[in-house]
Amino acid sequence: MLTRKQHELLMFIHERIKEGGVSPSFDEMKEALDLRSKSGIHRLITALEERGFIRRLPHRARALEILKLPDAASPSLAMARGRGFSPSVIEGGAQPKPSSRDLAPARSSGDTMTLSVMGRIAAGTPIEALQEESHQVSVPLNLLGSGEHYALEVKGDSMIEAGILDGDTVLIQRCDTATSGDIVVALVDGYEATLKRLRKKGDSIALEAANPAYETRIFGPDRVKVQGKLVGLLRRY
């Protein structure tokens, strides 16, 4: 399955080749997908190539060949293209913070609440974000505070010293601000999502892992958007 950004890029390349006989430049692709850097385009093209949708023609500039297109009737793609952004989660691209209309409504029953699990969040190197509900989970109300919440499954081991393991389900309170030291869902450059501890360092923002194998990453404040903060965790044994 393609992510929304992968699908958008594939269709943009397809339309440009169909119209003009040549694939668009990286700058044109970056502008069309509203990304901040060409590195995001490189990652998307590599992902499309690995999935067999395109190939790069050697020794030629702006030379991409479309090998196949996704099934236009795919419901997941239709949903991704037809609605706004939901909370940022794995393997592909995203946009600004989710609005309440994008989340399935939480349902309360006695001392539990049913939350949408919006995919998997990278607790490792930031990876492109998906945005579709994968399933739902019942959560004890005493783990949640006020406001809106959603859940994400953890992918990676960068937060193990904070007690967050690969495969855990983290409970996120939706917000767009955080206090230095909070563990947050951070969207980097508009399309990469990660679960990290946020530190404010002067005019910069540091995203800290809780695993010495991972380096702290420093960004300008305009490059990082908070999409929620950690309020609880579920684990299966």
Swiss-Prot record:
EC number: 3.4.21.88
UniProt DNA-binding residue ranges: 26-46
Statement: the UniProt record of this protein carries the keyword DNA damage: yes
InterPro entries: LexA, LexA-like, LexA/Signal_pep-like_sf, LexA_DNA-bd_dom, LexA_repressor, Peptidase_S24_LexA, Peptidase_S24_S26A/B/C, WH-like_DNA-bd_sf
Pfam families per the UniProt record, alphabetical: LexA_DNA_bind, Peptidase_S24
Keywords: Autocatalytic cleavage, DNA damage, DNA repair, DNA replication, DNA-binding, Hydrolase, Repressor, SOS response, Transcription, Transcription regulation
Active site: 158 (for autocatalytic cleavage activity), 196 (for autocatalytic cleavage activity)
Catalytic EC class: hydrolase
Annotated catalysed reactions: Hydrolysis of Ala-|-Gly bond in repressor LexA
Residues with site note (Cleavage): 123-124
Coiled coil stretches, renumbered: none
Region: Disordered, residue numbers: 84-110
Entry annotated with the keyword DNA repair: yes
GO biological-process terms attached to the record: DNA repair; DNA replication; negative regulation of DNA-templated transcription; proteolysis; SOS response
A GO molecular function held by the record: DNA binding
PANTHER family registered for this protein in UniProt: LEXA REPRESSOR (PTHR33516), LEXA REPRESSOR-RELATED (PTHR33516:SF2)
Entry's family note: Belongs to the peptidase S24 family.
Described function: Represses a number of genes involved in the response to DNA damage (SOS response), including recA and lexA. In the presence of single-stranded DNA, RecA interacts with LexA causing an autocatalytic cleavage which disrupts the DNA-binding part of LexA, leading to derepression of the SOS regulon and eventually DNA repair.
Subunit structure: Homodimer.
Name of protein: LexA repressor
Source species: Parvibaculum lavamentivorans (strain DS-1 / DSM 13023 / NCIMB 13966)
Taxon lineage: Bacteria, Pseudomonadati, Pseudomonadota, Alphaproteobacteria, Hyphomicrobiales
